């Protein structure tokens, strides 16, 4: 009898019991009552009403309340200066740099929000929150600490009525977009706007628990906790949270877009759908028929957002739309709401094109409805288009100019036809975007910035070397030369490869070591999906063979 084998098999059988997964808990405010979900990494294991007695430590959430007070009372900005004196500055900035309010909230810089530094008095604080019927723990400045335990229900109550929450929601999208949280934006899109938190799960302060709390894009409060830090909770459970969290279909950005419908086609007459009498200029409500000067016609629906105007004797249709409704209508006109991943990518491209090309008149963006810009449906967006748009609300792909086309695929141009093929192959929306726009980065509307500081000389060197290496590398099992990629400057840490975005991060491009790093990371990308792509010894040996030959 092979006793070693029997012991090994018994260990495998008992292993799941010994290392049983602690379920993730998700509290979500509902229309009738709050619900508590228990989730494993594979799905929902239990759903029940949220107990009034369930508690949570505040952890880093106290900073969100200080942020809300600062914003709502219009306190002047007081940047925190990092001097290298405190280990807590690792969450804030490098020595010699400073950090402002919005960034401090995203990075969870407690030193910035310290009430003593900001000269927040306990009396002023208490009066402010008591006037807003806040929970007792929130109105007491001395108890606003990470270790303070509060009921989850009272936490959701406070989030539902939190002052300045629209501003907080806008800023907290950056938490999901943090590149260190790999795969989170890919799985969740922009649907959650949350402040992360971590604290200790035991009195000995040896076991960590973490999670996040905040809102869905429609303002629904939520709270999450699980074992580990907030970062591990987000990355580990992003996939199952994607399946559980609802996608709102009535979401507004608060920003208006003025669109001249049918801008390139002269209008002859507009009538009610079942009438031959021309309607008079003014706000339109109902179903209408447009007859063009060339004899063609089309019907459309208006619920008061479209106005018939006359300018210099010519008819003109002007629609006043919310930005997200505009994106959804363009999706209906230029593409479709399926397959979902292709549609999500398209909404990001549409929104980015709008930001890069629209003009401004007062508080509104202005853009014509034309094939030279973006074509937009004259009727309200379909439910499917609104869902895809809500899934990516506020997301743009910042960097180089963005274009798209029904069938043509070139660098800098997303092909809808190719995007549908990529979606069918299992690629997610951010991978489709990275293929079309390799030098751009997923970002938010209010802060369009590319996280890739391009190293064009490094990319040009690699592009020149790839044909020279091809003969040798094609003999290696698993080699698949990437079609597109970007080479980016590494701000800190060690060189690495972002396989999803097809990006190679290196420190610089001056020395032999830089070329070794670039080649090494390129090979990780070229062997992605094959075991050798994860074998550091194999990759390093091959790197030196390529550069030393």
Residue locations for each model-derived region?
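Conserved, single-site charged/polar hotspot
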Residues: 19, 171-193, 197-209, 213, ...
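Short alpha-helical catalytic segment bearing the HExxH-like zincin motif
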Residues: 56, 60, 513-525
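Catalytic Zn2+-binding segment of zinc metalloproteases
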Residues: 73-74, 522-538
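Active-site SXXK
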Residues: 55-78, 104, 260-264
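A short, well-structured edge-of-sheet supersecondary motif
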Residues: 20-49, 212-217, 221-225, 484-486
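Catalytic zinc-binding patch centered on the HExxH motif and its immediate surroundings
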Residues: 31-38, 478-512
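Short pre-active-site segment immediately N-terminal to the catalytic Zn-binding motif
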Residues: 502-518, 528-534
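Active-site-adjacent helix/loop patches that line small-molecule binding or acyl-intermediate pockets
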Residues: 22-24, 80-171
């Amino acid at each position: 009898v092979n006793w070693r084998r029997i012991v090994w098999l018994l260990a495998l059988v008992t292993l799941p019991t010994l290392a049983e997964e602690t379920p993730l808990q998700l509290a979500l405010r509902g229309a009738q009552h709050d619900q508590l979900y228990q989730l494993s990494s594979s799905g929902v294991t239990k759903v029940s009403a949220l107990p009034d007695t369930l508690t949570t430590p505040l952890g880093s959430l106290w900073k969100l309340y200080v942020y809300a007070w600062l914003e709502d009372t219009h306190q002047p900005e007081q940047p925190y200066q990092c001097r290298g004196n405190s280990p807590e500055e690792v969450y804030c900035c490098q020595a010699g740099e400073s950090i402002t309010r919005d960034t401090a909230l995203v990075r969870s810089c407690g030193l910035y929000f310290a009430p003593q530094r900001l000269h927040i008095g306990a009396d002023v604080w208490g009066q402010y929150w008591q006037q807003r019927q806040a929970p007792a723990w929130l109105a007491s400045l001395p108890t606003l600490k990470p270790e303070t335990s509060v009921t989850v229900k009272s936490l959701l109550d406070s989030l539902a009525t939190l002052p300045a929450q629209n501003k907080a929601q806008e800023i907290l999208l950056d938490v999901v977009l943090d590149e260190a949280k790999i795969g989170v934006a890919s799985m969740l899109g922009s649907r959650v706007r949350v402040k992360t938190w971590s604290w200790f799960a035991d009195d000995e302060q040896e076991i960590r628990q973490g999670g996040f709390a905040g809102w869905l894009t429609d303002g629904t409060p939520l709270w999450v906790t699980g074992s580990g830090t907030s970062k591990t909770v987000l990355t580990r459970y992003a996939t199952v949270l994607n399946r559980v969290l609802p996608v709102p279909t009535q979401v507004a950005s608060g920003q208006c877009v003025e669109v001249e419908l049918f801008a390139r086609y002269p209008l002859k007459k507009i009538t009610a759908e079942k009438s031959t009498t021309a309607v008079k200029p003014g706000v339109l409500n109902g179903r209408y028929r447009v007859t063009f000067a060339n004899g063609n016609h089309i019907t459309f629906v208006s619920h008061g957002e479209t106005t018939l105007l006359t300018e210099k004797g010519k008819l003109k249709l002007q629609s006043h739309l919310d930005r997200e409704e505009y994106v959804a209508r363009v999706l209906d006109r230029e593409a479709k709401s399926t397959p979902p991943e292709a549609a999500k990518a398209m909404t990001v491209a549409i929104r980015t094109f709008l930001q890069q090309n629209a003009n401004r008149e007062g508080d509104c963006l202005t853009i014509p409805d034309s094939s030279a810009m973006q074509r937009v449906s004259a009727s309200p967006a379909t439910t499917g288009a609104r869902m895809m748009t809500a899934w990516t609300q506020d997301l743009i792909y910042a960097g180089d100019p963005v274009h798209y086309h029904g069938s043509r695929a070139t660098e800098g141009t997303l092909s809808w036809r190719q995007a549908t093929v990529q979606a069918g192959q299992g690629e997610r929306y951010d991978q489709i975007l990275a293929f079309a726009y390799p030098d751009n980065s997923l970002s938010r509307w209010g802060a369009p910035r590319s996280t890739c500081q391009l190293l064009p000389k490094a990319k040009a060197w690699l592009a020149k070397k790839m044909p020279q290496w091809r003969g040798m590398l094609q003999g290696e099992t698993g080699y698949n030369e990437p079609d597109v990629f970007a080479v980016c400057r590494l701000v800190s840490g060690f060189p690495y490869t972002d396989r999803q975005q097809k990006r190679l991060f290196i420190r610089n491009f001056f020395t032999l070591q830089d070329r070794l790093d670039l080649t090494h990371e390129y090979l990780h990308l070229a062997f992605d999906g094959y075991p050798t792509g994860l074998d550091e010894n194999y990759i390093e040996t091959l790197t030196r063979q390529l550069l030393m030959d």
